[in-house]
């Protein structure tokens, strides 16, 4: 684990950055699994846990009281980092991450909207 990506370190990093007149911007993500393209990289897998991983990463970010939060997500469906609308799909033995168990195709967009609203409330 990298120090800056470890959630428990985010309050300290935020404080340190402020002392240096700099910014620490924590980055949250929905999960990660790239073993389909990098089979040796299983130690970096972060299961989504029906949205709990994403929500917990947001809560950790909000607890640090940063000036901004970034969302690490892209259309890297093979890495499971997407938050856009998703429906179940298989390609051979590979099953793409979808949100049917978590709450539907828009689950992560709605969760992002809720967490951004919480972040906005903390800023004012």
Provide a role label for each language-model segment.
Residues 1-124:
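Glycan-processing catalytic domains of CAZymes
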